[in-house]
């Protein structure tokens, strides 16, 4: 049986990946340091003989046997990585370097989850993989964007020098059941605010656009990518754009229809538009997202409602 090592497996995407791999009957080792994510899943997974949890930090060196490495460990929400930008940069550089050396020693295949933020404030829409990107090193978010860029560089260096099988997924905005209300991502913010009957916080005029991909679609793509021979970066996401104000209205209408919005001053590094080109991933992996935004939001909202109901006395 193949052994999968998932770093950051208690995080949002990592937990969904673990669920899928366990469902598929694969052996999973989760390495996580409890810095974020959902510890509650451990009680369920620990009962499975094909699951093992290791408490640890990727900044430390480990001796773990595995055939496939899924490297997801990194602060991924703005609140997390802005809390300690230096640590965020170190995790991306030192942590990724440790894991690359470990994968090299194990002769393992690897998927590294990068981010759409490597493109920076890009005027080219949709964003294609060969766009070199522009990220201002002075911006607060650069610890994350540049951290992922240097991690990608390390992946390519190991790929060339040691002939390793390393795949790089540039993941765009992802949502679904299990998003933490406090993590600062726009969909979790809006759902949490609407469920608590408070005005939805919109930065700027809300005309900036994003595209959102349902998490199970992303998991489908990651599995296809791991099993492919493709070696270049590849976009994973949904190309359908929506303005932030329209997203707020959509979520508000699905919950209470209060139409209460609080417009906040936007930050200087706010990206005006973000949407992936999916041409390459369709050609290489024969993949495209299947869950539309409205249906995915229904599933996410229902999950949050059930969670709130359990917390009520």
Residue map of PLM features:
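N-terminal Rossmann-like NAD(P)+-binding domain of SDR-like oxidoreductases, especially those catalyzing
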Residues: 1-174, 216, 222, 273, ...
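Short, solvent-exposed loop/turn segments at secondary-structure boundaries
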Residues: 83-84, 178-183
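Hydrophobic alpha-helix immediately C-terminal to the catalytic Tyr-X-X-X-Lys motif of short-chain
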Residues: 150, 154, 158, 190, ...
